[in-house]
Curated annotation (Swiss-Prot):
GO molecular function per UniProt: 3-deoxy-8-phosphooctulonate synthase activity
GO BP terms, alphabetized: keto-3-deoxy-D-manno-octulosonic acid biosynthetic process
Protein name, per record: 2-dehydro-3-deoxyphosphooctonate aldolase
Catalytic activity: D-arabinose 5-phosphate + phosphoenolpyruvate + H2O = 3-deoxy-alpha-D-manno-2-octulosonate-8-phosphate + phosphate
Pathway(s) this gene product operates in, as recorded in its UniProt entry: Carbohydrate biosynthesis; 3-deoxy-D-manno-octulosonate biosynthesis; 3-deoxy-D-manno-octulosonate from D-ribulose 5-phosphate: step 2/3; Bacterial outer membrane biogenesis; lipopolysaccharide biosynthesis
SUPFAM superfamilies: Aldolase
Keywords: Cytoplasm, Lipopolysaccharide biosynthesis, Transferase
A Pfam match: DAHP_synth_1
Main localisation: cytoplasm
Enzyme class: transferase
EC number: 2.5.1.55
Length: 280
């Protein structure tokens, strides 16, 4: 699949979607995007900058949600123009989709909304590539129905994203079999390595996380075979205004990415023997 300025799929090198969970300031966005662009160029990984103008699903009303639509889009446009990278942001049911699609290169739908038919189809109709996050409550094979909804809206630039499955209270687990199953949709599969270590609502009024396991799950996903990785990052995650506990530290991003790129090259050069049994 053609995605921004590169090809995405198991026949192509892994790509990275990364940035702070939420837009905190213009300067942080520019600094983070610039550093990510440079390190991705050194490693040889295509890059899409990600950050949100509004986090509508925070645990508490006391949690920081973002800078809002107008200021958020202005900053994303500035990142595009000054840093020269494609940008992605998530949208919600009350988002003016046409306004957002006029600025960003990729639209993302939140996991909680993956079953909302009208929403998925309205996003797909904007003519942008869409990254559909699989709900924490959804089986991987059920993503076929979600993808069908998007395609029926006339969009064939669809990605599906795994971000963990609910396992008891305040805990997520990642079933790597689901990555292979979701390939049967015919869409590039993305693994969200940072939200997969989140502990939803684990701190009462905010979510906890175990960022020390981000490399473990990222390596496992790349070894299983994915088109791309989604990893939120921050220069100082402990001071991040949203999802800091599961964000990967920006100073450690290049070191991790080198390992993942090396592993991706080896795995994709060998092919995927399980495809003989799966409809991929």
């Amino acid at each position: 699949m053609k995605l921004c300025h590169f090809e995405a799929g198991l026949e192509h090198p892994i790509f990275l979607i990364s940035g702070p969970c939420v837009i905190e300031s213009e300067q942080l966005a520019l600094d983070t995007a610039g550093q990510l662009k440079e390190l991705c160029e050194r490693v040889g990984v295509p890059f899409i900058y990600k950050s949100s103008f509004d986090k509508a699903n925070r645990s508490s009303t006391r949690s920081f949600r973002g800078l809002g639509l107008e200021e958020g889009l202005r900053i994303l446009e500035t990142v595009k123009q000054q840093i020269g990278v494609p940008v992605l942001t998530d949208v919600h049911e009350d988002t003016p989709l046409e306004e957002v699609a006029a600025v960003v290169d990729v639209l993302q739908t939140p996991a909680f909304l993956c079953r909302q038919t009208n929403f998925i189809q309205n996003v797909a109709r904007q003519g942008r590539p869409v990254n559909i996050k699989k709900g924490q409550f959804l089986a991987p094979w059920d993503m076929g129905n979600v993808v069908d909804k998007a395609r029926e809206a006339g969009n064939d630039q669809i990605m599906v994203c795994e971000r963990g499955v609910s396992f008891g209270y305040n805990t997520l687990v990642s079933d790597m079999r689901g990555l292979a199953v979701m390939r049967e949709t015919g869409c590039p599969v993305v693994f969200d390595a940072t939200h997969s270590v989140q502990q939803p609502g684990g701190k009462g009024t905010s979510s906890g996380g175990q960022r020390e396991f981000v490399p473990v799950l990222a390596r496992a996903a790349v070894a299983s075979g994915v088109a791309g990785l989604f990893m939120e990052t921050h220069p100082d995650p402990d001071k991040a205004l949203s999802d800091g506990p599961n964000a990967w530290p920006l100073p450690l991003m290049e070191e991790l990415l080198v390992t993942l790129k090396t592993l991706d090259d080896v795995v994709k050069a060998q092919g995927f023997i399980e495809s003989r049994f799966l409809n991929t």
